[in-house]
């Protein structure tokens, strides 16, 4: 898109490349803006006369790190937000300029939250730039809380569902990794939404690798843990510790995403099937 708009695009192998640093200095920029990028060397973020600002998708100081969108949902938070701040030597620790809060439902997915914050973030950045331009910024130091929640990078081990977890935690993992936007659209960026997955084994020992895109949680606990319930038409329920989850949308390896009724129409589940 930048190339279409005839905006210069540079892709240096190293951010400390002398030619790249010289190019940035030649711009004589008032301000640099960073979104979803790794740590910048000081020799770069100190170049502009007003410094360098970052847009972060959490309410700092909580959820510093690479995966704030996912981690707030996986942890079952009821609120998150976005923050603009001045970059300094430490990751996501600079002085806060502006913040905006966003309420979360118990079913918000990572893809949905990504899009919400993307749109709100553009407005917050515009407001931040205006404040800097008008010399009206009253930035504040980040609070030095004793128990700050972190947002480390996602890893492959996290994405596989551990069925020994409580039902609500599994539901939060599913939505915290889910690309589901609407019934007709999924976010395609797997770095943001890799999907939680498990193996479903038939009574004939056929193994389906299943990515879960959408689930619903219920506190109902009067059934055998790890048992499966289905009407073979419209619902697929897995009974778990402290509740159950209904699978509403899934994706088999190498296939397109489908809703549960489509899956059940071609697969006759019974109590002999195993989740792993």
Q: Which positions does each model-derived feature cover?
A:
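Donor/substrate-binding cores of folate-linked one-carbon enzymes
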Residues: 29-161
């Amino acid at each position: 898109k930048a190339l279409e708009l005839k905006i210069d695009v540079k892709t240096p192998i190293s951010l400390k490349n002398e030619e790249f640093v010289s190019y940035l200095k030649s711009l004589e920029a008032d301000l640099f803006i960073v979104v979803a990028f790794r740590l910048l060397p000081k020799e770069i973020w100190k170049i502009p006369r007003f410094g360098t600002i970052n847009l972060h998708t959490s309410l700092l100081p909580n959820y510093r790190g690479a995966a704030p969108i996912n981690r707030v949902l996986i942890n079952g938070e009821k609120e998150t937000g976005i923050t603009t701040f001045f970059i300094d030597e430490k990751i996501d620790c600079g002085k806060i300029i502006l913040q905006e809060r966003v309420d979360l439902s118990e079913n918000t997915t990572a893809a949905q939250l990504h899009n919400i914050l993307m749109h709100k973030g553009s407005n917050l950045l515009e407001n931040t730039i205006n404040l800097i331009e008008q010399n009206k910024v009253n930035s504040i130091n980040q609070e030095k809380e004793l128990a700050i929640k972190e947002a480390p990078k996602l890893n492959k081990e996290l994405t596989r569902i551990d069925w020994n977890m409580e039902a609500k935690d599994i539901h939060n993992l599913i939505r915290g990794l889910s690309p589901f936007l609407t019934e007709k659209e999924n976010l395609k960026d797997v770095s943001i939404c890799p999907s939680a997955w498990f193996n479903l084994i038939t009574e004939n020992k056929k193994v389906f690798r299943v990515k879960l895109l959408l689930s619903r949680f219920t506190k109902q606990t009067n059934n055998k843990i790890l048992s499966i319930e289905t009407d073979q038409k419209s619902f697929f329920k897995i009974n778990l510790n402290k509740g159950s989850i209904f699978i509403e949308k899934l994706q088999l390896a190498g296939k397109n995403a489908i809703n549960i009724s489509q899956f059940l129409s071609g697969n006759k589940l019974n109590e002999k099937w195993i989740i792993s």
